[in-house]
Amino acid sequence: MKMKFMTFCMAACILFASCGTTMNNKGKGALIGGGSGAALGAIIGGIAGKGKGAAIGAAVGAAVGTGAGVAIGHKMDKKAAEAAKIEGAEVEKVTDTNGLAAVKVTFDSGILFGFNSSALNSKSKVALAEFANVLKEDPTIDIAVFGHTDKVGTVEANQKVSTNRAFAVQQYLQQCGVTPAQFKEVKGLGFSEYNEAETAEQNRRVEVFMYASEQMIKEAEAAN
C-alpha cells in the first residue's frame, strides 16, 4: 500500500498519485510542536481535499510542546502503517490545524459503493472492519469522515450521495465497535473539491482523517 508524507502550513490541496514515499513523522512532530504559538496559529487551513471542506484538529487553544509533538507523531506513524495494510486504502501523513501529525485514509468509492449508491458492498465491509480495528485501539484518536463525488448529475444529487456515503462509512465503523464520540465531523462535499487532474473514478472517494484529540494532546503534554 502506498504512503506519502505531505505537510501543509496553510489550506492545502491533497492529491494522491500513483506512487509515493514514506517519511517518519517523529521528527516533524518535534519541529512543528516546538514552534512558536504564532507559527502554529498560522496553520489555519483545512486539510480535506483542497481545504474548502473543513479544518481538522482539537481546539486546544495553545501551542503544543516539542515532546508532545514527538509522542503524537510516533502514534500517528503507527496508525498510518497499520492502515496501509488494508486493501483499497490510500494512506497519507498530513498535518492538523495544531501543526500535529495526522493521517488521511482515502477509500475509493468504486471499491466501497456501486454507482450512485451509498450501500456498502461486501468487499468494502471487510476493509472497513479491518480499519475499525485500527481506530478502536486508541479511543483518544479523533475522526473526521468526508464523502466526495464526480461531476455527473446535479449539485444537489451529488451532495446527497456524498453525505449518505460518509454516514454509511461512519455507521459501519461504529457497528464494528468504534466509539461514536470519536467522530467529530461527518459530511458530504459533493464535487466541491473535484480535482480536474484526476479521473472521475478517483474523485469518487471517502476520506477518513485520524488526528489527535484534546485528551491525547493533554496526555502527551503531561508525559513530556
Which residues are covered by each model-predicted region?
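Amphipathic, membrane-active segments
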Residues: 75-104
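Extracytoplasmic
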Residues: 86, 98-102, 106-108, 138-140, ...
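Periplasmic peptidoglycan-binding/anchoring modules of Gram-negative envelope and division proteins
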Residues: 112-147, 208, 215-224
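Bacterial N-terminal signal peptides that target proteins for export
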Residues: 1-9
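Short, low-complexity, glycine-enriched hydrophobic/amphipathic alpha-helices that associate
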Residues: 20-82
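Periplasmic OmpA-like peptidoglycan-binding domain that tethers envelope proteins to the cell wall
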Residues: 148-219, 224
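Solvent-exposed, polar/charged alpha-helical surfaces in well-ordered, non-transmembrane soluble domains
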Residues: 81, 85, 122, 126-133, ...
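C-terminal motif of bacterial Sec signal peptides marking the signal peptidase cleavage site
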Residues: 14-18
